[in-house]
């Protein structure tokens, strides 16, 4: 069989001129604090969109789908693009036929050993009075394009969710598996309070979706929550999210619908542990936050999200695993910063000197927002905040 051309080579087949970063260096007094950099994007920059899917591998940032507006004009799209982090160049990959239909919040991850992407599940818009969820699963590689993966009835049921998925390389093996926790499984009105509106389990994709038997305790079912893999801890981290109203059973945008808990899933023992802290000193209840696992310093970083009253955030916090306390740092940061947003595409990575969070696009609010297609990088030096 002829060896397929690596996906990175496809992306750089027509190399653009190297672009420079548009950024401001932190001053000496700020050198150890995190700082934001706005990225000057080249190539075919995607149109403003939000609530799509993200994946990253070795300098390549992939995005798929999302919504191109807000209610009642929030139509899903099937846009497919890749950003080369080295050349700061976007490439449109929409020329490949047979891929997933237009959708938002699909699970997507990169399979390194196959140089391939997987897209699974997702949803259409809310507030249409219809169940517009998806439960199909697709594979993409540059040699074969898109291929739909056959699934059993049980796998179809587990794929019917809209949430984040993370890729994990199994210890001692050259095999990528993916994990996803909970997520929405309906777009019907008041879905969050319906018995079938949320998935309740942790699932693993390894030649198909399978349920992970985790036992108790376990986090409550939720949607719009971040999920991150901490490789050195061999753990998954979850914070907050949007859930059912356990007090009155009917609330949709009340404080009871938003969570502010922090959980760690040990991939070795397959058990959950809640990381307890004084909520009065933490980020509070929110959904749509983004997380970074700082294994270097024993911290979990959190960026942004949205509150029950519609407030969109751009704050930056870290949780110290040793002291079980939260510290807010954006109030001490200087220089340019992105506007508050949610539903942005993103990835994080570790470099030789820092952790980095890249964000692209998003919406400034759920109702009557501005849709964005700017890109920013948050740099968190290893020496930060010591």
Regions found by a protein language model. Give the residues of each.
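Kelch-like beta-propeller repeat domains
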Residues: 29-386
